[in-house]
Regions:
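A short, acidic, amphipathic alpha-helical segment used as a generic capping/interface helix at domain edges
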Residues: 20-34, 47-94
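Acidic/histidine-rich catalytic cores of soluble enzymes
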Residues: 1-39
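Noncatalytic linker/hinge segments flanking ATPase motor cores
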Residues: 44-51, 139-143
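Active-site beta-loop-alpha junctions enriched in small/polar residues
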Residues: 8-12, 39-46, 101-105
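Sequence termini and other peripheral, non-core segments
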Residues: 13, 69, 73-87, 96, ...
């Protein structure tokens, strides 16, 4: 059985932005038995995190200390509005395809793809710095 990692729901449940080089994700990749895996990606609703900076990943501990509840944070946004979270999610493209879960469906996927293509050089530089010692295979996105 091939397992699918939902990175948003993992964050909601644990407060952790899991790394694509995490051993737990490696086990998920292995469950696909040579086929390129898929992950699910969504972001908390824009109308829940009103005023949150788009260049800062939401911090679960801070949100829970405020008026936010996990049940509300679980809900999918219309678009992938947080670029810091997008940058993190796009790190997974080296290892898996990304299935966008959002209210705006294909429009959100197209917008994320546009963000990726406009920023992939900078994202690649960040990934090289972060993973200089990694020996994980690098895949080409299928977009």
């Amino acid at each position: 059985v091939a397992l699918v990692l939902d990175i948003h729901h993992h964050w909601v449940n644990s407060g952790e932005y899991i790394s694509p080089t995490d051993d737990r994700f490696a086990r998920i990749i292995d469950s696909w038995r040579g086929v390129r895996p898929v992950i699910h990606y969504s972001v908390s609703r824009e109308d829940i995190l009103i005023g949150h900076p788009t260049n800062v990943q939401p911090d679960m501990d801070i949100l829970l200390a405020g008026e936010y509840k996990k049940a509300k944070l679980r809900a999918h946004s219309d678009y992938m509005w947080n670029n810091a979270v997008n940058d993190w999610a796009l790190e997974f493209l080296q290892y898996a395809d990304i299935m966008v879960e959002s209210k705006a469906k294909n429009l959100a996927s197209v917008a994320l793809h546009k963000y990726y293509t406009e920023n992939k050089n900078e994202l690649s530089k960040q990934n090289v710095r972060q993973k200089a010692s990694s020996e994980q295979p690098i895949f080409t996105p299928l977009w």
